[in-house]
From Swiss-Prot:
Name under which the protein is recorded: Small ribosomal subunit protein uS2
Pfam families in the record: Ribosomal_S2 (PF00318)
Higher taxonomy: Bacteria, Bacillati, Bacillota, Bacilli, Lactobacillales
MF GO annotations: structural constituent of ribosome
Organism, as annotated: Pediococcus pentosaceus (strain ATCC 25745 / CCUG 21536 / LMG 10740 / 183-1w)
Recorded family membership: Belongs to the universal ribosomal protein uS2 family.
PANTHER family cross-referenced by the UniProt entry: 30S RIBOSOMAL PROTEIN S2 PROKARYOTIC AND ORGANELLAR, SMALL RIBOSOMAL SUBUNIT PROTEIN US2M
Region of interest called Disordered, as start-end residue ranges on this chain: 223-260
Highest taxon, organism lineage: Bacteria
Keyword terms of this UniProt record: Ribonucleoprotein, Ribosomal protein
One CC-aspect GO term: cytosolic small ribosomal subunit
Signal sequence residues: none
Amino acid sequence: MSVISMKQLLEAGVHFGHQTRRWNPKMKPFIFTERNGIYIIDLQKTVKLIDNAYNFVKDVAANDGVVLFVGTKKQAQTAIEEEAKRAGQYFVNHRWLGGTLTNWNTIQKRIKRLKDLKAMEEDGTFDRLPKKEVALLNKQKDKLEKFLGGIEDMPHTPDVLFVVDPRKEQIAIKEAQKLNIPVVAMVDTNSDPDQVDVIIPSNDDAIRAVRLITAKMADAVIEGRQGEDEEEASQEVAEGVSKDSLEDLKKSVEEGSNEE
């Protein structure tokens, strides 16, 4: 059973590619036909490849991996933030700052600054400062929040990137490649699939298409994490059982000795 049905993909407009004059020939294997000057994506392939992507992300999450959701184009911003939060993961939905991955130590310093400013606001420090200074600090805080708020609590560089539109997120993808971080991406007919490790051929411009697939990747994280939680719980039960068995064994040995 596929994680997304053909009907859902059709309703969300996942099959609509770009105009035929704006295409990347490497996407030819994923194109079904051309209609009114627009390429139509082969949804039979998309269904299978979404399953691949789902299982890949689920496995990463099951191993306590960190997933970074990336989509800075307007159509993706809301879905990227909401679905990453729902999955308990991290996101970049405004401009990707160069070095976010490759210069992680410097980025962490800027995140620390953001946390310090938030603490100053909460503990009443701002109330004791001149209004002009507070205005400047608030401006700085808002800017840092906009670009780094989604990765503020990310414990380390991610184990996988989920990207909406690799053409738009070139810098993020190049940084991931440098660090050997796998990339799962929604790839439209105008993108280069060779840049992506796990491809999802899809319309990456329609809000409904972006929401549908981003939500499914969030579901994969949640399912993977639930599997991990269940494994931990069963391990605890097993440890409890073996502990009880050991106690029972000791007890029976002691009782046997007493009888002698």
